[in-house]
C-alpha cells in the first residue's frame, strides 16, 4: 500500500486521541528513529534515550484504551528494537495496570514490554508470519489488538524503522537531513577520527552527532504533529484526489474545445511508468505527489469487499490481510479502516463523465445565433425610443384639463 494509506491512518488516530495522545506519539516518533541507531551506540532502552519517565494521565489512558488502533500505530511509529524495549511497552505497561484483562494470560514474556516473543522463537513456525504485505499475518497470541508489526526487509538498510517513516520525513520535513546522510556522516567521522587522533575523538564525534540527530528529529516531529493536529486528514485526502481529478477534467475540456480526441491510454501508461520508476519519483518532489495520489486512487479502487471492511473492534494493520478466528479456523480477510470507506463515498459522489456532445453543440449554437441576438437588442431600443416620441392619448388630455380647472377655482376662492 502507498504512503497515503499508512500515514493518514496515523494522523487520524492521533487526532482522535487528543492533544496529550499527540504529544505521546510525537515523542514515540523521535524514539523510533533513535532506536535505529542500536547497532552503533548500543541504545536498547527507549527511556534511556530521553532520560525521563513517561507520565500518562487518566484521560490519555482512557483514550489509548478505547482506541487500540492508536496503540498499534504508536507501536509502528516507535518500531521497537530487537530487545523489545520501547515507549509502546511503557505505555502498555501503564495501561495494563488499570486494565489487566487486555493482555491474555498466555502472552509470551520474553521481553521487558511483553510485546515481542522470547529468544529462539521461530517466526515461520506457525506464529508470526513475516511475509509480504498482502499475505495473511498471524499473531503469536489471540490478542490481535496487541500483535506486533513484523520487521520487513527495508530498502534503506536500517533495521527496525519502516519505510513510511523516511517518506514522512522527506515529504513533511524537507529541511532536515535524511537518516542515511546522518549515518554516512557518523561512519565517516568514526573512520577519519580513529585514523587521525584515536578513540577519544571518535566517542566525541559520535556523541555530538547522535545528540544533534535526536534533537532535530524531536523538534521536527513535534512541529509536524502539531500541524497535523490542527488539520482534517480525511477531507485533506478528499481534496487532494478531487484536485487531481479536476486537473484531468480541465485538460480534457481543453482538448475537446480544440477538437482533439481524449487519449485515455496516455494517463494509464503515465501512471504505470510512474509506479515502475518509484525510486525516481521519491527523488523528485513533484513526481512524488503525483505518485502518491495515483497509488491512493489505485489501491482504493481495488479494495475487495467481503463484509469485513468496517471492523469496529478488529485490527486492520494499515490495510493488510489479517487472520480472524472463525468456525472453520483462521480465515484471511482484508480489513479497511472506516476513513477509507468515507473517502470512497466522497469520491464517488462527484465523479461523472464529460458530456462531449453537449459541449460541442453549445459552442456551435453560440456561434450561429450571435447575430440574431444583436438584432433583437436593436429592435428593443427602437421600440423604447418610438414610445417616448408618440402623441399623448385622449385620456391623458382630459386629466390635464381637469387639473387646470381645479387650479383656477382655487385661485378665485383666494381672491
From Swiss-Prot:
MF terms (GO), sorted A to Z: DNA binding
Any one Gene Ontology BP term: viral penetration into host nucleus
Region (DNA-binding): 358-409
GO cellular component: host cell; host cell endoplasmic reticulum membrane; host cell nucleus; membrane; viral capsid
Entry annotated with the keyword Membrane: yes
UniProtKB keywords: Capsid protein, DNA-binding, Host endoplasmic reticulum, Host membrane, Host nucleus, Late protein, Lipoprotein, Membrane, Myristate, Viral penetration into host nucleus, Virion, Virus entry into host cell
Region (Disordered): 102-121, 365-415
Lipid-modified sites (N-myristoyl glycine): 2
Composition-biased stretches (Basic residues): 372-415
Motif position, Nuclear localization signal: 377-384
Annotated stretches, region: D1: 318-353
UniProt similarity note: Belongs to the polyomaviruses capsid protein VP2 family.
UniProt-recorded name of the protein: Minor capsid protein VP2
